[in-house]
Amino acid sequence: MTKSTVLLLAALLAAPLAVQAATAPPANVKAAFGNTVLTIDPDGRSRKIWLKPDGTWTGLSRRGLDLAGKWSVKGDKVCLKQSKPRLLGSLCETFPTRPETGVEAQDPTGKTIRLKLVKGHVTH
């Protein structure tokens, strides 16, 4: 194997690691892995969302219907793109930095909601 072939192979093997390191989520997002993100509406009903380290998420709607999609980090916001049921676009919100207090946000209709992180995989 020539020196240039070895260097090319090393670069190809290292590239995915560099991309993964560059896109590592912040600590407040990592804290959601294995736990439940609640989006609480003014009427008290909530959606449950579970972020996974691989960039996907699953959840339950206010009515208990299955939700799923992909998530990404853009600046200080977490963006959810929903594929089940399919919705166009994505919703980006500031993610709670203090799980016990949560953060106020706006839903797509402009209604004020509260985002809160709850320990464990809460389903009810």
Label every PLM stretch briefly.
Residues 6, 17-124:
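Lipid interaction determinants
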Residues 12-13:
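Hydrophobic alpha-helical transmembrane segments of integral membrane proteins
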Residues 1-8:
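Bacterial N-terminal signal peptides that target proteins for export
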